[in-house]
């Protein structure tokens, strides 16, 4: 797996940061919203505009507290299970995807569904279906219980085993060691995933790779940007929610790449001034489900403590955009 994937996007470049005197912020680029999150959030906004409140959303549309609270104030109602949605109502499926059984449940309740599953998650679903049809054992590297993993595993429950971490490899048993493939959750740490795959391949030498990288371009790009700046930072602040897999991974990557400390915050107010004691360089990034307004709040908070020099660290240029679900696309003139 390459260290970063730009999906054919031109303009990717590495940025050299010149050292300045005094306190400074290194600001990772890219950061924040990915194409799948942007699409999912806009899907709920457009559904509210088109149909009016309430619009039901199965699970948090994306894993970010601010985004969910903002959409809830606009009229979105977030539920955990399909049977919480009134019969005949409109329901949006979150960016993380759902298992086929959820579509069946929705049809039984005569729900009008809008599927905001990220297309890169849908790609992994299709891979699971394809290899299950060919009777492979599918080893899904991912976090047990995460919505995305539940949805992908649900495509082929008799063929999929979830491998949560490198140590879980010891417990994996397959029917035919020559018909085994690994797939992964899209928001994992690249390094930890590769360690899990290395250990799987030690156990199953003919283990097949996915047709293309399952860890999404945005997850990889954000991790690469953090790796580029972390060695120069005494502290890295990751803006993101605790239930956001890709945001939590950024904290881990920052620590692994050399930052003395790294913390996850939802809001600027979550920053403890004690974190800044003796610090001259703070790195700032944000998870793929984080709107830029929250990053700006963090920069303002840091400026109050003398960190008013902001230097970008650019490792990729993202221009990818996904089309909205057909149910809420604007009508053609």
From Swiss-Prot:
[4Fe-4S] cluster binds at residues 34, 118, 216. Disulfide bonds: none annotated. The active site is at residue 148. InterPro entries: LytB/IspH. The keyword Iron-sulfur applies. Binds 1 [4Fe-4S] cluster per subunit. It is an enzyme of class 1 (oxidoreductase). It catalyses: isopentenyl diphosphate + 2 oxidized [2Fe-2S]-[ferredoxin] + H2O = (2E)-4-hydroxy-3-methylbut-2-enyl diphosphate + 2 reduced [2Fe-2S]-[ferredoxin] + 2 H(+); dimethylallyl diphosphate + 2 oxidized [2Fe-2S]-[ferredoxin] + H2O = (2E)-4-hydroxy-3-methylbut-2-enyl diphosphate + 2 reduced [2Fe-2S]-[ferredoxin] + 2 H(+). Transmembrane segments: none annotated. CDD domains: lytB_ispH. Its cofactor is [4Fe-4S] cluster. It comes from the Bacteria. One of its GO terms (molecular function) is 4 iron, 4 sulfur cluster binding. Keywords: 4Fe-4S, Iron, Iron-sulfur, Isoprene biosynthesis, Metal-binding, Oxidoreductase. Belongs to the IspH family. Catalyzes the conversion of 1-hydroxy-2-methyl-2-(E)-butenyl 4-diphosphate (HMBPP) into a mixture of isopentenyl diphosphate (IPP) and dimethylallyl diphosphate (DMAPP). Acts in the terminal step of the DOXP/MEP pathway for isoprenoid precursor biosynthesis. PANTHER family: 4-HYDROXY-3-METHYLBUT-2-ENYL DIPHOSPHATE REDUCTASE. This is 4-hydroxy-3-methylbut-2-enyl diphosphate reductase.
């Amino acid at each position: 797996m390459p260290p970063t994937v730009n999906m054919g996007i031109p303009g990717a470049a590495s940025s050299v940061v010149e050292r300045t005197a005094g306190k400074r912020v290194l600001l990772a680029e890219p950061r924040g919203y990915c194409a799948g999150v942007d699409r999912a959030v806009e899907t709920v906004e457009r559904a509210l505009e088109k149909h009016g409140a309430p619009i039901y959303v199965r699970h948090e549309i994306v894993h970010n507290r601010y985004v969910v609270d903002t959409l809830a104030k606009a009229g979105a109602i977030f539920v955990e299970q399909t049977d919480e949605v009134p019969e005949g109502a409109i329901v949006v499926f979150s960016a993380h995807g759902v298992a086929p059984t959820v579509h069946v449940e929705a049809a039984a309740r005569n729900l009008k569904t809008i599927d905001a599953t990220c297309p890169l998650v849908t790609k992994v679903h299709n891979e699971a279906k394809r290899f299950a049809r060919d009777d492979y054992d599918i080893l899904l590297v991912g976090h047990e219980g995460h919505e995305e993993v539940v949805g992908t595993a649900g495509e082929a429950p008799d063929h999929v085993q979830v491998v949560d971490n490198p140590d879980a490899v010891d417990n994996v048993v397959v029917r035919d060691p020559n018909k085994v493939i690994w797939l992964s959750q899209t928001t994992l740490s690249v390094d930890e995933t590769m360690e899990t795959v290395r250990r799987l391949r030690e156990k199953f030498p003919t283990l097949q790779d996915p047709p293309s990288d399952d860890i999404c371009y945005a997850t990889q790009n954000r991790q690469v940007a953090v790796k580029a700046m972390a060695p120069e930072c005494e502290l890295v602040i990751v803006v993101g929610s605790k239930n956001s897999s890709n945001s939590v991974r950024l904290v881990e990557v920052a620590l692994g790449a050399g930052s003395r400390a790294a913390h996850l915050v939802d809001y600027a107010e979550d920053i403890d001034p004690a974190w800044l004691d003796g610090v001259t360089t703070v790195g700032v990034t944000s998870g793929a489900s984080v709107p830029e307004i929250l990053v700006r709040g963090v920069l303002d908070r840091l400026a109050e403590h003398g960190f008013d020099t902001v230097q970008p660290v650019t490792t990729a240029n993202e221009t990818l955009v996904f089309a909205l679900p057909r149910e809420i696309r604007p009508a053609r003139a």
